[in-house]
Regions:
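N-terminal, positively charged/glycine-rich alpha-helical extensions of SAM-dependent methyltransferases
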Residues: 1-20
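A short SAM/SAH-binding and catalytic strip from SAM-dependent methyltransferases
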Residues: 115-127
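A short acidic, Gly/Pro-enriched loop at the edge of an enzyme's catalytic core
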Residues: 104-116
Length: 158
């Protein structure tokens, strides 16, 4: 599973919607995107955690984590689109460490992170199997992977 050969097309679409990216996330989540991020993160991260925000976009998941811990976590933003990472300054007083790349090839050490966040992004992996393996590699043995995403229904609602 994963996007496979469609990944380039999806990346092109994501690049095009950068100006309205947050509005699109809100729309497709029926206005519940912030609520879902808060519910997923609250109580699951601790002060001092090292966090990888995989598929970070503008960094909304990271911003939520920083708000919940009063800034007492260490964040690394990671996204395939450099323009997304460059536009994170509107959310952060001090810009977190950031890198550009895909789920399947994280430029991180083995067991480097206490927590990996993936908000509305895992569905865009090239290869879901490889992405899961790579996230497992960079997570500490007792680490947590917090995923907020939407699925595609098998049938349309009539």
């Amino acid at each position: 599973m994963g996007l496979g050969s469609y990944w380039g097309e999806v990346l092109d679409v994501l690049q095009e919607i950068i100006p309205v990216y947050d509005k699109v996330n809100s729309y497709i989540s029926l206005g519940k995107d912030s609520e879902h991020r808060n519910r997923a993160i609250d109580g699951r991260i601790q002060d001092g955690d090292k966090i990888l925000d995989a598929g970070s976009g503008f960094g909304n998941m990271s911003k939520t984590a920083l708000d919940i811990t009063n800034g007492k976590v260490e964040i690394m933003l990671y996204d395939p689109l450099l323009p997304m990472i460059k536009n994170t300054n509107r959310l952060f007083k001090k810009k977190p460490e950031a890198a550009c790349g895909v789920f399947e090839h994280a430029p991180c050490k083995n067991q480097q992170f206490d927590v990996v966040l993936s908000g509305y992004s895992l569905r865009d992996a090239i290869s879901l199997k490889t992405a899961i393996s790579e996230i497992h590699r960079v997570l500490k043995n007792d680490g947590k992977w917090i995923i907020v995403d939407l699925g595609k229904p098998d049938k349309a609602i009539i």
